Amino acid sequence: MAGTSRIFFLSNLFSISLRSILPRERSIYLKNTHAQVEYAMRAVRQGSACVGIRSDKYVVLASVKRSASELASYQEKLFRVDDHVGIAITGLVADARVLTKYMQTECLNHKYTYESQMIVGRLVENVADKHQKCTQSYVRRPYGVGLLVAGCDKTGPHLYETSPSGCYYEYKAMALGARSNSAKTYLQREFEKRGDDGFSKLTEQELVFHAVRSLKGCLAGDKKLNAQCVSVAVVGVDKSFEHLSDEEVSDVIKEAIGDDEDDTKDNEEEDEDEDDDDV
């Protein structure tokens, strides 16, 4: 009985912070339940979508922002870590703030000690280790947030993804969050169109265009992209991490979505012509 009581005590410690996304307050020690890291990864899948694309010179991050109600402001999903690094987040924003501060501190400590910018891959590895430690301790639950880390160091531009499990991967293009499969499909199709080069030869403007356009299918219902609900940021070999202004984002949306609407109209006209020919 004492052992059973201890198990239930530990289960409460595990589940209390993720109560909003857990079906019931149980832990990995109880039968017919899932590991807490699975619930953390579910939070990532339910978060608003974010996209990252990398070329030989630049990395672009774009994210869909959500508001709790019509009277609430939109939550920012892109954060600057250092001059050469920034992140896009999906999942629990409170957890993302903790990891952002940790990454900022790591970069500052490295700059103070070595008088140079921190290698992006090393920073990502440190964050992944922080993720992984939470999967082995009952005192703290896993971070319910996924990160797209964009950075540029002496080895060139980089785009990484980290997950609550502690795994991390480097990508040429990646999308996370709710309905992100639509963005992944678009990015994969555009990547394959360009053959072996992929996105490597694209300019900054072209990367921004494709990042924004890929987000079109990530919105719920009949919602449309606008400058209020979309954030875009760029970092590159000769460019510090910088957010695009609302005016710049609005212009890109008009260009990207406008072209898409024109293509749709052309396709509809072609279908009508084919119907006339059949008659």
Task: Give each language-model segment a name.
Residues 1-279:
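Long, low-complexity N-terminal extensions
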